[in-house]
């Protein structure tokens, strides 16, 4: 059993925060010091409220409590069960004394007790309560964090305290990054917890460069723990074939092979024993191991060399293997700290070596195909159903399905990408403890990364079968390791039939059915090249390796590697999505310790070509000679109701176009307006205002589908009636200024109009009656105006607009003084 690395051990004599003792679930042993009161936290009705009460009781800032707990557990309490490294509750409190670490990450001896025991001493809560009561665990974790704090104001003063939960700089930085970015999620038991983003939080300094001897991005705590390249025994000759635990190559240079995949594994064991295995020359090696508790990374192999990790030499030749501490049958194993450091590492490797960030090239060990007939049944199934691919690819910056919305609008011939969700996707599983000891029993309601496929469109139908994974079985099962009928998030499928909410898709040589409910669709439309078999009578063979043809070995001294088809076929009438149409057909020869064997350390390339496919649960290969490749096609879409135009058909009026209705759900549209059948340059918005030049002419709009998945089909509206003259709108009425006295002059303001007028005409009014000849902008008052009220009537005009008239308010009666 591994020793968890949780940071500096909690000393029995650690400073306690002085608060009254909680009366409930108290430890029976007495204590001479005062304890943190957990009473309010224990009675909090929600996890959100419990964080607030614990913050009040301990003095730890509530956002910091949430951020630390998120990195340790994503706020899941594991239902009273131990998590990946034996911890309990949202703070992952450990039963064992953790190893102590100093600032240089060098272990040092310390008299220590477990986190559970220390939290019990600080709060008076029993160890059992701290393990099993979520609110008790929150109070205990908060008390521990408070006891680690050495004073100071502000969130930055808590960095050392945070480090004692995670031991590594990565963990501290991740906690503070979480404070900056915020998080909100619903936990496995339905609790909504929200951490509001605070961009004012200062991040701890990032490492400026990775340590020597590691291929990691700056800022990650990586250490070199090299895998040995050694003979089986010292007495063996240099040309011995008995050596381990990897092969030398030039994968990052011109010698090849190329790097095309990153394989995600779990260790099915603890960190320390796993790292020791990678150091055993008689065992096998992979490139990296990532620790669960804090995401710490150990690098074992240089990317140029070939690890022995995938169980498939072709995949080994072309891949980097990353082991994650954990067990595939344990629902709560994979920590947020592990996800984040792993994603940061993978993003770095993918960018450096040109590996696509997609689910066909960043793959699980469970996606690696067998090598020869009968080998598929022996392949691995890690990282298993509890690895959150959706979250992982979000962290990679390459979300599954991109920014497209899941849709129920699917038709035969469509290629779809499955997006399962995770926390909201609790599929039934059985046999977790037996399939992946020492995992506990499968947890009902736990999130999963797959959806089941059925043999007919019904959830009571038998699960789909996989003749390679379970030869002779007529149906898949819910057993934890049985991937026969599991389509995992990111997988691409070709739709053959649609029946209501059910999609009939091609799977392992048969038609299988995926439930895609309209109220919670699980697929996004995508584009992919596809293949169909050339022969109407002979199915295409499916391979687990893209090896060269026999003639390529001639004269090399390298034994021919037989092309052994797998248990699968592609019959006539079936279509599968292509995940890579530019594969290298090669075989890297490596059989002797010193590379002196015939053709050793040579990457032999062939002329035969293969495509990589999505097929059943895995990635497989098919010879191009046996299939036809079809370019990604946009699906057809038709207008069912033409676009319409609404709004006033007049100069200056705003016309609005509706898109009409279409046979498929379309992501968007483009618009083009026409006047008397001629395209109006630049008129490409959903709205259009006819100008003066449009007077008397008819307008129509052409709407074109703007969706990468569908053909760019267009439809036109009916033409409008001829555009009528525009109308003015008075925003501010005319006004008269000046003193209404005989001998004085009044002046007219025309007011404010929309649109602006070109001309304005004036008519002065005396008690509402036009004054003959008074048509200027000013009016001189005479004796005729004595006692009258004077106003002005303004008429505005412009080209293509109907004249408009408005009258000012009248003055007070004209006086002589």
Predicted regions and their residues:
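Ser/Thr/Pro/Gly-rich low-complexity disordered regions
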Residues: 635-817
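SH3/SH3-like (including bacterial SH3b) beta-barrel domains
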Residues: 465-489, 495-498, 554-564, 568-569, ...
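N-terminal catalytic cores of peptidoglycan-degrading enzymes
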Residues: 39-46, 191-311, 381, 510, ...
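Boundary regions of SH3-family modules and the immediately adjacent low-complexity/disordered segments
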Residues: 507-556, 595-599, 605-635
């Amino acid at each position: 059993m591994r020793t968890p690395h949780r940071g500096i051990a909690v000393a029995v004599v650690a400073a306690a925060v002085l608060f009254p003792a909680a009366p409930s679930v108290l430890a029976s042993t007495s204590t001479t010091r005062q304890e943190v009161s957990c009473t309010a936290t224990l009675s909090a009705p929600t996890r959100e409220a419990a964080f607030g009460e614990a913050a009040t009781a301990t003095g730890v800032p509530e956002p910091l409590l949430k951020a630390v707990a998120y990195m340790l557990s994503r706020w899941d309490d594991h239902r009273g069960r131990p998590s990946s490294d034996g911890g309990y509750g949202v703070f992952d409190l450990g039963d064992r004394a953790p190893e102590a670490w100093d600032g240089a990450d060098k272990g040092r001896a310390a008299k220590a007790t477990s986190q559970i025991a220390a939290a019990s001493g600080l709060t008076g809560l029993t160890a059992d309560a701290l393990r099993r009561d979520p609110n008790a665990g929150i109070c205990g974790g908060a008390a521990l964090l408070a006891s680690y704090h050495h004073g100071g104001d502000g969130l930055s003063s808590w960095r050392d305290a945070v480090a004692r939960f995670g031991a590594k700089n990565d963990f501290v930085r991740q906690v503070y990054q979480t404070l900056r970015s915020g998080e909100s999620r619903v936990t496995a038991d339905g609790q909504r917890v929200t951490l509001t983003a605070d961009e004012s939080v200062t991040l701890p300094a990032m490492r400026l460069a990775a340590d020597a001897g590691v291929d990691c991005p700056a800022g990650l705590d990586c250490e070199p723990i090299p895998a040995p390249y050694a003979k089986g025994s010292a007495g063996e000759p240099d040309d011995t074939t008995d050596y381990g635990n990897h092969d030398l190559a030039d994968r990052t240079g011109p010698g090849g092979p190329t790097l095309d995949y990153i394989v995600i594994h779990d260790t099915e064991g603890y960190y320390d024993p796993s790292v020791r295995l990678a150091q055993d020359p008689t065992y096998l090696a992979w490139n990296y191991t990532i620790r669960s508790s804090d995401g710490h990374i150990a690098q074992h192999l240089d990317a140029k060399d070939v690890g022995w990790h995938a169980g498939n030499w072709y995949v080994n030749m072309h891949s980097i293997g990353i082991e994650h501490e954990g067990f595939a049958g344990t629902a709560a194993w994979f920590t947020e700290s592990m996800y984040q450091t792993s994603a940061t590492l993978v993003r770095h490797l993918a960018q450096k070596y040109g590996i696509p960030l997609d689910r066909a090239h960043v793959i699980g060990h469970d996606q690696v195909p067998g090598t020869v007939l009968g080998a598929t049944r022996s392949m691995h199934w890690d990282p298993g159903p509890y690895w959150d691919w959706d979250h992982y690819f979000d962290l990679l910056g390459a979300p599954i399905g991109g920014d497209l919305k899941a849709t129920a609008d699917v038709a035969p011939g469509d290629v779809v990408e499955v997006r399962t969700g995770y926390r909201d996707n609790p599929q039934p599983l059985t046999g977790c403890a037996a399939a992946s000891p020492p995992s506990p029993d499968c947890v009902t309601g736990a999130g999963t990364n797959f959806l089941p496929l059925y043999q007919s469109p019904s959830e009571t139908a038998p699960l789909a079968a996989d003749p390679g994974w379970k030869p002779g079985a007529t149906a898949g099962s819910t057993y934890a390791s049985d991937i026969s009928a599991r389509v995992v998030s990111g997988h691409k499928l070709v739709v053959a039939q649609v029946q209501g909410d059910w999609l009939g898709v091609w799977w392992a040589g048969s038609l299988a059915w995926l439930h895609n409910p309209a109220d919670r669709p699980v697929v996004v439309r995508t584009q992919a090249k596809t293949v169909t078999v050339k022969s109407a009578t002979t199915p295409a063979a499916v391979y687990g390796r893209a090896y060269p043809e026999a003639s390529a070995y001639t004269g090399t001294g390298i034994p021919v590697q037989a092309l052994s088809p797998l248990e699968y076929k592609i019959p006539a009438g079936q279509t599968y999505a292509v995940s890579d149409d530019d594969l290298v057909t090669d075989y890297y020869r490596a059989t002797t310790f010193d590379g002196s064997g015939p053709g050793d350390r040579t990457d032999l390339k062939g002329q035969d070509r293969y495509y990589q496919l999505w097929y059943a649960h895995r990635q497989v290969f098919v010879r191009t000679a046996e299939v036809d490749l079809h370019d990604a096609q946009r699906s057809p879409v038709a207008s069912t109701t033409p676009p319409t135009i609404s709004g006033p058909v007049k100069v200056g009026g705003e016309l609005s176009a509706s898109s009409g209705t279409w046979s498929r759900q379309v992501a968007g549209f483009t618009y083009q307006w026409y006047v008397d059948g001629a395209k109006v340059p630049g008129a490409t918005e959903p709205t259009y205002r006819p100008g003066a030049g449009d007077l008397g002419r008819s307008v129509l709009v052409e709407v074109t589908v703007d969706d990468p998945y569908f053909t760019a089909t267009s439809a036109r509206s009916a033409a409008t009636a001829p555009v009528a003259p525009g109308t003015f709108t008075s925003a501010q009425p005319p006004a008269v200024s000046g003193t209404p006295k005989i001998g004085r002059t009044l002046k007219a303001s025309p007011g404010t109009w929309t649109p602006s007028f070109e001309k304005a005409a004036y008519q002065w009014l005396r008690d509402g009656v036009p004054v003959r000849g008074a048509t200027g902008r000013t009016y001189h008052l005479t004796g005729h105006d004595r006692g009258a009220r004077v106003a002005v009537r303004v008429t505005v005009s412009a080209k293509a607009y109907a004249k408009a008239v408005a009258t000012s308010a009248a003055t007070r009666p004209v006086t002589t003084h």
